[in-house]
């Protein structure tokens, strides 16, 4: 009886503990739903501002700071894709470690107090190799991607379930007390679904049903999918989404990808998006009824290893995002958007309460007003003209609206923010070069520290095989390597016309891309590259008898977008012919017996990660020769700034630091000369090629090396140089920030948005004038000089300011007095401070300062 009584007590205690656990979980769990205005969390509509950070494009050591900077910038949500190819590189062999530790990334966002939007896809596009699909998926029998195909649906459901179950196990959905408030299935399918016919409709319905069956307890969305079945929320992607409307009056207006810039391709100039236009797009979206928008990207990061897609997407995925590739703030973009977010949040009570009332204020001018029953009022005044500024009357008061701008009035009276008027300083950044040599010697002395191994030209591995005809590359390599050798031995008779004295043969090659090198009898004869198709005519010297033709085909990222992108293909598909340079008949080589080798000998022997006795250290170091592996050791650059390698002097290849692949390098890929301008007018619709820089220059010379991959000393750099270059020209560079600050603020600027309180009232009536604020970005810095200061009509931009026809003689001395020796300073932009240098014009204060 005594034992039985104890057992009853134990069971009662277990029940009590279980009840307590249920209560605790219930107390922390959130109920996430939606209505026509917004996502609803625990019964309250939310205005949400989100930003994309892709966890594999940075390192776990970088994640906390990236997430904190996102929060400091005014974000509520971190949005990320889930990268199937990284998590399941081989079928049923999973990877959730290192840069692919998705659980850790989501938990860090939660720790910072941010929500998460998990875009499972599992097709992601993202300029990621093969759109995020693992290439083994291509070889599943009977499979057809992204359509009503049973093998594909089975694999898609299996992986999606794997991710959802993992999130559930870690209690990461909001319904479990976690940060995930929204999940996405599929991705931009509506852009290309017409190519799949009727099967696309049934596939989308199946995708929605499958996702809902996983019972996450939070809503699901489909982006760019106008026929997304209920209860899926269809969302918008693009540079502008103010005109977007969801496919049901019961769904909120949501923007899952607001492209903050654009991606860079090898051979292309660098695109950028002016922050005035980006802010305009955001303000217009909230003006027109939106309540959730996401920056794609907020931090772009780096395409480490062989993850870049395209083809020909660069290793840098900087994207001109508010936080740059290296994790530093891009100013004034980050700061201007932070101020925008504060202004929008001042309007939240009114925004979520009702739909806007939109009225015309004139041609290309409009007002949107949100009012609550309790009397809260917020207004957005827009001028969508691309050239002309305007003065409008609203509620009996005049407001100046620059062209292509929106003013936000959290109380329907006072302007808290205008998208075209920046109150955040431009902060200069620069790379400081450091030699690889431990004692700081010149890079010219580095040859003695380098060792090398020559990669054999042509067939060198035991697993090479013979096949008649030309094989498509992806089907042959399964993307295990960028490299595929096509080798042919052909006999040339002595009476061939191209053996005549002074005559050459022409080797004609056609390839699907992306790079081809042609070796004749062991010597490089020519090469070419192209995104989709390569056609080469290479003059070559042949000999009577047996000649060896070795063609090395190289991929630079697999296609990631478009209908049937998985079938695009790569490699040498022919025709391949020999003919005389003088004309005449040609010899067909394509149909002959070719020997194939997948990958390089150096890859098989692990030269990037495993020490080898084959490394040669003797001088002279062979340079400007193709197909050479190089290795050196180096000390980590001093300081804590982000690190890059400048590959200027090399050709093309792949590099590793301490066994970690930093990606493909290609500093000899030069952008064309057309399309770049000294400045870019933010006014008017943005497009990917509107604002370009670095024309006529290498697309990318600097390649990110995360600090966490480095040791203080004894670091190993290995590179495979395929094209031919001089590795002794390589240098390290650390990215410095904050030495120069520049800002121009006019009398027509609104006061700093920080002067507003959360109840939409100006907190300090003495601070209702515009203010120029400067702050050194590093806590140990102070402003030590004012290079330029002018209150009046200054001209120019940062680094080239000049005085205009009107200037207060007190400008420099007053700014120096207010700022020198301080980390931050505020200077009121008014005649009360500077006097009246000229009447009848709106005056500005322009300042360029230096931080110590």
Curated annotation (Swiss-Prot):
Entry-linked Pfam families: BetaGal_gal-bd, GHD, Glyco_hydro_35, SUEL_Lectin
Entry GO terms, CC: apoplast
Gene Ontology MF term list: beta-galactosidase activity; carbohydrate binding
Keywords, alphabetical: Apoplast, Glycoprotein, Glycosidase, Hydrolase, Secreted, Signal
Glycosyltransferase as UniProt keyword: no
Catalytic reaction annotation: Hydrolysis of terminal non-reducing beta-D-galactose residues in beta-D-galactosides
Domain SUEL-type lectin: 766-852
Tissue: Expressed in roots, flowers and siliques.
Protein origin, superkingdom: Eukaryota
Glycan attachment positions: 31, 258, 475, 766, 807
GO biological process assignments: carbohydrate metabolic process
List of catalytic residues: 188 (proton donor), 257 (nucleophile)
InterPro entries in the cross-refs: BetaGal_gal-bd, Galactose-bd-like_sf, GHD, Gly_Hdrlase_35_cat, Glyco_hydro_35_CS, Glycoside_Hdrlase_35, Glycoside_hydrolase_SF, Lectin_gal-bd_dom
EC number: 3.2.1.23
Localization annotation: Secreted, Extracellular space, Apoplast
SUPFAM superfamilies cross-referenced by the UniProt entry: (Trans)glycosidases, Galactose-binding domain-like
Enzyme class: hydrolase
Transmembrane segments: none
Chief place where the protein resides: secreted
Position of the signal peptide: 1-29
PANTHER family with a match to the protein in the record: BETA-GALACTOSIDASE RELATED
Family as reported in the entry's similarity comment: Belongs to the glycosyl hydrolase 35 family.
Record's protein name: Beta-galactosidase 8
Species this protein is from: Arabidopsis thaliana
Name of the coding gene: BGAL8
């Amino acid at each position: 009886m005594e034992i039985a009584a104890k057992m009853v007590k134990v069971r009662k205690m277990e029940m009590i503990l279980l009840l307590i656990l249920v209560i605790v979980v219930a107390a922390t769990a959130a109920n996430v739903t939606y209505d026509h205005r917004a996502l609803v969390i625990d019964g309250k509509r939310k205005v949400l501002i989100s930003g994309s950070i892709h966890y594999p494009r940075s390192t776990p050591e970088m994640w906390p700071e990236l997430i904190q900077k996102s929060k400091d910038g005014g974000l509520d949500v971190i949005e990320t894709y889930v990268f199937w190819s990284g998590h399941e590189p081989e079928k049923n062999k999973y990877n959730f470690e290192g840069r692919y530790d998705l659980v850790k990334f989501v938990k860090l966002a939660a720790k910072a107090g941010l929500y998460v939007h998990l875009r499972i896809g599992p097709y992601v596009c993202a300029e990621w190799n093969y759109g995020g699909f693992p290439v083994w998926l291509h070889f599943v029998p009977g499979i057809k991607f992204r359509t009503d195909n049973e093998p594909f649906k089975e694999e898609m459901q299996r992986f999606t379930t794997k991710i959802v179950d993992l999130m559930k196990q870690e209690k990461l959905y909001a319904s479990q007390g976690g940060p995930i408030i929204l999940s996405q299935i599929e991705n931009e399918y509506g852009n290309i679904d017409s190519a799949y016919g009727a099967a696309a409709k049934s596939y989308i319905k199946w995708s929605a049903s499958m996702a809902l069956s996983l019972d996450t307890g939070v809503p699901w969305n489909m982006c760019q999918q106008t026929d997304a079945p209920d209860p899926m929320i269809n969302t918008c992607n693009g540079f502008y989404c103010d005109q977007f409307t969801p496919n049901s009056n019961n769904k909120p207006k949501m923007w899952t990808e607001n492209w903050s810039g654009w991606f860079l391709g090898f051979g292309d100039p660098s695109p950028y998006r002016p922050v005035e236009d980006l802010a305009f797009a955001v303000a217009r979206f909230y003006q027109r009824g939106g309540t959730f928008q996401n920056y794609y990207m907020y931090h772009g990061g780096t395409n480490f290893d062989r993850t870049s897609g395209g083809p020909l997407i660069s290793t840098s995925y900087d994207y001109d995002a508010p936080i740059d590739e290296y994790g530093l703030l891009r100013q004034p973009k980050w700061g201007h958007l932070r101020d925008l977010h504060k202004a929008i949040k001042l309007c939240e009570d009114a925004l979520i309460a009702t739909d806007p009332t939109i009225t015309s204020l004139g041609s290309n001018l409009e007002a949107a007003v949100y009012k609550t029953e309790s009397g809260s009022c917020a207004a957005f005044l827009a001028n969508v003209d691309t050239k002309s500024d305007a003065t409008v009357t609203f509620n009996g008061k005049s407001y100046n609206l620059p062209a292509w701008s929106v003013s936000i009035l959290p109380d329907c009276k006072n302007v808290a923010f205008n998208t075209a008027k920046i109150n955040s300083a431009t902060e200069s950044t620069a790379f400081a070069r450091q030699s690889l040599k431990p004692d700081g010697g010149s890079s010219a002395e580095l040859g003695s520290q380098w060792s090398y191994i020559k990669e054999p030209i042509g067939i060198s591995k035991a697993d090479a095989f013979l096949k008649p005809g030309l094989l498509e590359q992806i089907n042959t390599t399964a993307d295990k390597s960028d490299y595929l050798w096509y080798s042919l031995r052909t006999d040339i008779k002595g009476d061939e016309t191209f053996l005549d004295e002074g005559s050459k043969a022409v080797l004609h090659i056609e390839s699907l891309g992306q790079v081809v090198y042609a070796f004749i009898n062991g010597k490089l004869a020519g090469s070419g590259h192209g995104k989709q198709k390569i056609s080469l005519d290479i003059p070559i010297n042949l000999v009577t008898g047996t000649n060896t033709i070795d063609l090395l085909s190289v991929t630079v990222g697999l296609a990631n977008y478009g209908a049937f992108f998985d079938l695009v293909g790569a490699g040498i598909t022919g025709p391949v012919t020999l003919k005389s340079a003088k004309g005449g008949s040609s010899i067909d080589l394509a149909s002959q017996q070719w020997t194939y080798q997948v990958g390089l000998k150096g890859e098989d022997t692990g030269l990037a990660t495993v020490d080898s006795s084959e490394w040669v250290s003797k001088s002279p170091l062979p340079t400007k020769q193709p197909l050479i592996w190089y290795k050196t050791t180096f000390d980590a650059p001093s300081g804590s700034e982000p690190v890059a390698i400048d590959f200027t002097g090399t050709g093309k290849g792949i590099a590793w630091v301490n066994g970690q692949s930093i990606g493909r390098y290609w500093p000899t890929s030069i952008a064309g000369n057309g399309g770049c301008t000294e400045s870019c007018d933010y006014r008017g619709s943005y497009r990917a090629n509107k604002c370009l820089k670095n024309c006529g220059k290498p697309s990318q010379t600097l390649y990110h090396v995360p600090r966490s991959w480095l040791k203080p000393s004894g670091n190993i750099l290995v590179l495979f140089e395929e094209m031919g270059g001089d590795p002794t020209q390589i240098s390290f560079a650390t990215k410095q920030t904050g030495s120069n600050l520049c800002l121009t603020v006019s009398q027509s600027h609104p006061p700093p948005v920080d002067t507003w309180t959360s109840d939409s009232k100006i907190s300090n009536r003495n601070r209702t004038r515009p203010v120029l604020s400067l702050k050194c970005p590093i806590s140990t810095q102070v402003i030590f000089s004012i290079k330029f200061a002018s209150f009046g009509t200054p001209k120019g931009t940062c680094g080239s300011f000049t005085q205009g026809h009107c200037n207060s003689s007190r400008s420099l001395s007053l700014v120096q007095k207010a700022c020198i020796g301080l980390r931050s300073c505020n200077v009121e932009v008014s005649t009360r401070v500077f006097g009246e240098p000229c009447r009848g014009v709106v005056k500005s204060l322009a300042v360029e300062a230096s931080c110590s």
